[in-house]
Amino acid sequence: MKAAVRYYTKTGNTKRLAEAVAKAVNAEALPISVPVKEPVDVLFLGNSYYAFTIDPEVRDFIRSLDKSKVGRIVNFGSAAMLNSTWKKVKAEAEKVGIAMDEREFHCKGEFKGMHKGRPNEEDLKAAAAFAKGIVG
């Protein structure tokens, strides 16, 4: 199964998760500014809530995806207060005809003194194990 990893981060938390996910699935963690050019079975997409929704750059990235090159999207991320962006990402993925995996990985992320040190080593190991479980 071929996988790609893209992420969007403002704090660096999601990048750390993306690197753990990428290592687990034998891919490279790249920012969403790098398009998905080769066909993949799974696109791991790392993101978080910003101002109570996904960042417009994440929305634009999803809208730019070629459904003939992406089998499905697997969501992952971290946040200090809110939880999953899954529903928001799914809504955008549906607009471009890309399936959204029901499974996702989410953990707490450090922000303005909250959840100091997160994601931590345990979170990174859990993200890697999650990704391995997706690709088999």
Q: Each predicted region: which residue ranges?
A:
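FMN-binding flavodoxin-like domain, especially the glycine-rich phosphate-binding loop
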Residues: 3, 9-28, 39-136
